[in-house]
A protein has these predicted regions:
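Conserved TIR/SEFIR loop-to-helix hotspot centered on a Trp-containing motif
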Residues: 63-73
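Conserved N-terminal substructure of TIR/SEFIR domains
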Residues: 1-60
Length: 73
């Protein structure tokens, strides 16, 4: 896994989905919830696994991101 993308769901359409798709098209293996999570997966376990396996992390900082409580995790 090359890159883990952390973001607020409100930022998906405008920024995160296009970013993740572009990185994949360039050959990077990206952990992005819409690419990685499957029906019935534990979100927390999947995130923990993605974080532990990714070489790099990308945090999309926005007002929406900071309004969430989970960034304190």
């Amino acid at each position: 896994m090359d890159l883990f993308i952390s973001h607020a769901s409100e930022d998906k359409d405008l920024l995160v989905r296009p970013l993740a798709a572009r990185l994949r098209s360039l050959g990077y293996e990206v952990w992005y919830d819409e690419f990685t999570l499957r029906l019935g997966d534990s979100l927390r376990r999947s995130i923990d696994k993605g974080l532990s396996q990714a070489r790099y992390g990308c945090v999309v900082l926005s007002e929406s991101f900071f309004a969430k409580q989970w960034p304190q995790y």
